[in-house]
A protein has these predicted regions:
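Compact integral membrane and secretory-pathway proteins
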Residues: 1-155
């Protein structure tokens, strides 16, 4: 291989994947009009998917870098899968909670103006580019583990 043995492809993919996960923790995931953007690091306290996700994504990022530096790329299966599962879980929980608020706000006998405002804002919520950063980081970790597995099976 054209890379030095200490910086083989699985190690580099693991390092860059971990760095992307760490960067993705601060990147905007969801934009809600008037309220602003949510990320794993900037979110309301009652949005538990991001509270837990913050710890999970940053731990996966840190462990991925450590595993890559220790040249243990097979362990990146774990961190990549956990990061991807956390991202999917966050998006599913947000969609479920947003749909519940919108359904409650659409009731004909509702007189709560805050609930009507929240329902209207959530109808126009959209996903942002931070999702792609976290997803690409997780996929890079899985690719690093796959490369290491392929290299180990050839030997």
């Amino acid at each position: 291989m054209w890379l030095r043995p200490s910086f083989q492809l699985p190690v580099l993919l693991g390092l860059f994947g971990g760095a992307l996960l760490a960067a993705g923790a601060g990147a905007p995931l969801i934009h809600i009009p008037i309220f602003g953007s949510l990320s794993y690091l900037r979110h309301p306290a009652d949005f538990t998917a991001c509270s837990i996700g913050e710890i999970v994504i940053l731990a996966a990022a840190g462990l991925s870098v450590v595993f890559a530096l220790l040249k243990r790329p097979m362990l990146l299966w774990l961190t990549g899968t956990v990061a991807l599962a956390q991202l999917v879980g966050t998006l599913v929980i947000f969609e479920h909670d947003a749909a519940a608020v919108v359904a409650k706000a659409d009731q004909p006998n509702l007189v709560d103006p805050l609930m009507m405002w929240a329902g209207s804002a959530l109808q126009h919520a959209r996903f942002e580019w931070g999702i792609a950063v976290v997803a690409v980081g997780a996929v890079m970790l899985l690719a690093a583990a796959l490369c290491a597995w392929r290299d180990a099976s050839k030997a």
